[in-house]
C-alpha cells in the first residue's frame, strides 16, 4: 500500500467578513503534498481572501486553518510563513536587492546562513529557474517572464512546502505564461503543494484539482474533467469553460458511428463560441 499523502493546508469551516460583508463563508478544503490546485472564480468570489488568510495577512473570524495538521496561531504566524511562499501578479513589488543575486540572497541572509551555503542555494535555484544567465542584472530591467522566474527563485531559495501563485501569469505574454505554468507542474511533481489563484481557465486543465469559488462559497471541487462537465451549473455564474475540456465533453457525447464531417462541424461550432 502506498503511503497516504499529508494535507499540507486545510481550511475548516473558515469565515471572514469585511464591514459586515461576508467574503468567505464556511469554507472547507484540503490541499496535499505534491498537489497542484487551481482556485478559480470571478472578482469578489473570495479567491484573494484565501491567499491573504494563508499568508497571515488576514485572521479568520471563524473556523481554523491547519498547516501540516497544526492549527495556525494567527497571533504568531512565524510557523505559517516558514511553510508558505507566494508569487504575486506584479513581481516588481517583491524585489528588494540591487541585483537578481542580491534579491535571492536577501531571505537567506535573514536566516543567518553562511555565505557558502547562500551561494550553493543561489546556484541551485537559479539553475532550476533558468535565471543563472542574468543574476548580476537589476531585476527591474528584466522582461515580465524573467521577473517572475526571479520571484520564483527567491521563494524556492527559502524552501517552503506550500507555494502560492496569486494571478502570477496575468501580465505575461503567451510564451512566458507557458514557462511559468510548466514550473507549477514541475514543482508539484517535486513534492511541493502548489496553489494557483487564477483567471486563466486553460491553466486549470493541467491542475490535479480545481476549486470553484462564488460569492465566498466553494461551489465545486474535484479534478478538472469532473468540475467542468457541469457546464450548465458553471454557466449560471458566468464562468468560462476551458475550450479543451468543453471539446472533450462534447466529443464523448458523440456516438462512435458519426462521420468526420459532422465531427468537424461540431468542433468548429465550439470554437466560434470561445
Swiss-Prot record:
One of its GO terms (cellular component) is ATP-binding cassette (ABC) transporter complex. Pfam families: ABC_tran (PF00005). Keywords: ATP-binding, Cell membrane, Membrane, Nucleotide-binding, Translocase, Transport. Its EC number is 7.-.-.-. Gene3D superfamilies: P-loop containing nucleotide triphosphate hydrolases. Belongs to the ABC transporter superfamily. Energy-coupling factor EcfA family. PANTHER family: ENERGY-COUPLING FACTOR TRANSPORTER ATP-BINDING PROTEIN ECFA1, HEAVY METAL TRANSPORTER. ATP-binding (A) component of a common energy-coupling factor (ECF) ABC-transporter complex. Unlike classic ABC transporters this ECF transporter provides the energy necessary to transport a number of different substrates. This is Energy-coupling factor transporter ATP-binding protein EcfA1. It comes from Mycoplasma genitalium (strain ATCC 33530 / DSM 19775 / NCTC 10195 / G37) (Mycoplasmoides genitalium).
Amino acid at each position: 500500500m502506498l503511503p497516504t499523502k499529508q494535507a499540507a493546508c486545510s481550511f475548516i469551516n473558515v469565515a471572514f467578513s469585511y464591514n459586515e460583508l461576508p467574503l468567505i463563508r464556511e469554507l472547507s478544503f484540503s490541499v496535499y503534498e505534491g498537489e497542484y490546485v487551481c482556485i478559480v472564480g470571478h472578482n469578489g468570489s473570495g479567491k484573494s481572501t484565501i491567499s491573504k488568510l494563508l499568508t497571515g495577512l488576514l485572521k479568520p473570524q471563524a473556523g481554523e486553518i491547519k498547516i501540516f495538521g497544526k492549527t495556525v496561531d494567527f497571533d504568531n504566524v512565524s510557523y505559517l510563513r516558514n511553510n508558505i511562499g507566494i508569487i504575486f501578479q506584479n513581481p516588481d513589488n517583491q524585489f528588494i536587492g540591487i541585483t537578481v543575486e542580491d534579491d535571492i540572497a536577501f531571505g537567506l541572509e535573514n536566516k543567518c546562513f553562511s555565505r557558502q551555503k547562500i551561494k550553493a542555494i543561489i546556484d541551485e535555484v537559479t539553475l532550476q529557474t533558468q535565471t543563472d544567465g542574468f543574476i548580476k542584472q537589476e531585476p527591474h530591467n528584466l522582461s515580465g517572464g524573467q521577473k517572475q522566474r526571479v520571484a520564483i527563485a527567491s521563494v524556492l531559495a527559502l524552501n517552503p512546502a506550500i507555494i502560492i501563485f496569486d494571478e502570477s501569469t496575468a501580465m505575461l505574454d503567451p510564451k512566458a505564461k507557458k514557462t511559468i505554468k510548466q514550473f507549477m507542474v514541475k514543482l508539484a511533481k517535486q513534492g511541493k503543494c502548489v496553489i494557483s489563484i487564477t483567471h486563466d481557465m486553460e491553466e486549470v486543465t493541467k491542475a490535479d484539482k480545481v476549486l470553484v469559488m462564488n460569492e465566498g462559497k466553494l461551489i465545486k471541487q474535484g479534478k478538472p474533467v469532473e468540475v467542468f462537465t457541469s457546464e450548465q451549473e458553471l454557466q449560471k455564474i458566468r464562468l468560462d469553460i476551458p475550450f479543451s475540456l468543453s471539446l472533450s465533453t462534447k466529443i464523448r457525447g458523440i456516438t462512435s458511428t458519426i462521420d468526420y464531417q459532422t465531427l468537424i462541424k461540431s468542433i468548429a461550432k465550439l470554437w466560434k463560441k470561445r
